[in-house]
Amino acid sequence: MISSITRLLSLVLAAGLSTSALAVEGDWGQVAQALGKSGSEMPGGVYRIGLPRTDLKVVLDGVEVKPALALGSWLAFRSEGDQALVMGDLVLTADEVSPVMQKLAEEGIEITALHNHLLRTAPATFYMHVRGFGGPAKLAAALHDALVLSKTPLTASSGAAPSQIELDTALIDRTLGAKGRVNGGVY
């Protein structure tokens, strides 16, 4: 149990905080092929695949929620010798949760949390945190088999969202004391 927690914490730190040199040991091409979508190599030997739910039109209190704001599924792999650790966060609709969860359990992928970030959305969206350890391509294939039970797009995105948005970004920057950036129509 402590070994699993240590591995999980090291992946979280590597994915979010590490600035060490790139040290990819895995064959991420096999992961991309098995999953059906490629990702990018991150610092700390992490291979991350973004899976934004661009197929969903989610509305919260009359406001459309953009995928870049709160609908971004992702998976991150890190080599552990000839094995890999994977963790991620899958954005799912209510009707997708049960079949995806069942398939992941059958394939030996752990569900570490199921919750929602946004109340009152239509459709309702849920966030399933996952974790697995094993052969990288086998993990990716298991995740693919679960994701195809949802409508999560597994192809490249259709292009970048406009870089201009209708916000006073200078005021936001001054107020926060930091410069932001536009990403997928979100600042």
List PLM regions with ranges.
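Bacterial N-terminal signal peptides
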Residues: L8-S20
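Boundary at the C-terminal end of the N-terminal hydrophobic targeting segment
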Residues: A21-E25
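N-terminal secretory signal peptides that target proteins for export/translocation
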Residues: M1-T6
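Acidic/histidine-rich, surface-exposed loop or edge segments in extracytoplasmic proteins
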Residues: S79-M87
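Surface-exposed interaction/gating patches
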Residues: T93, A161-Y187
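Hydrophobic, ordered structural segments
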Residues: A94-T112, A122-P162
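Intrinsic, low-complexity N-terminal interaction/targeting segments
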Residues: K57-A76
